[in-house]
Amino acid sequence: MTAQTDVTENIRTRPIFIAIANQKGGVGKTTTVLNLGAALAAQGYRTLVVDLDLQANLTHCLVEPPRDDQPNMCEVILDEVSVAGVIVSTDTPNLFVAPAGESMANLEINLAAAIGREQALRTALQHAAVSEFDFVLMDNPPCLSLVTINSMVAADYIVVPVSCEYLPMLGLKWLLKSVEKVRARLHPNLKILGYLLTMYDRREGITTDVEEILREQFGDEMFTTVIRINTRHKSAPSERKTIFQYEHSRRGRGTEDFSALARELLKRLSLPARRSRRSAG
């Protein structure tokens, strides 16, 4: 059963919060947040991407990372500064980032002692500055942590990238256990919007094997769209560009894939493929 629902009215009054999560590293979480965010922005949806990974890869893909004396999402989550004070515009119209910084390395320790520690991110994002967005996409660290739990608690939906390899597929059971615990204890309405195959290479036999297993297991919860293997996804961040900026062509492989993903995601949410100027405000 898919997470399709009519949120057309909700998009006008509050953002849709989506956590991009998988407890296995190297499956394309940051690439997905970066380029899905850019694809939604290109369709007229004001999109905020939130970097919750201490490596700050998403931040480096878009903007100069904060200096040591500048606040980032660590201080936001710890309620030391407002999220409005860290949101930065990017070179892509409608796309904004809430960056991570070096202080994220201490976030887990400080958050562990906080009251309402699992709710800290959700509370921080309940801000007028965030309500101006249509979508908030959250990039997560490659492990189950308090930060990941915070992201799930703050999210309406989860999108799960799975690279076409054996080990990431095995790791899904741990993610699903985490989701069930969050639903049971903290957020019963949390939904999985879909599973996304990444690093897809039809020439590799393992790709076909993984796809068959996952589509049989998850059925309609699997996105029809796949993100094909593409060396440009590795090259674009070095120039602080999204795949759309880097390929600069509607026929580029990455551009095609993430445009298709955005359309499919919007369809699952019963939202128009393009945000009208009037409703975008």
List each language-model region with its residue ranges.
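P-loop NTP-binding core
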Residues: 1-281
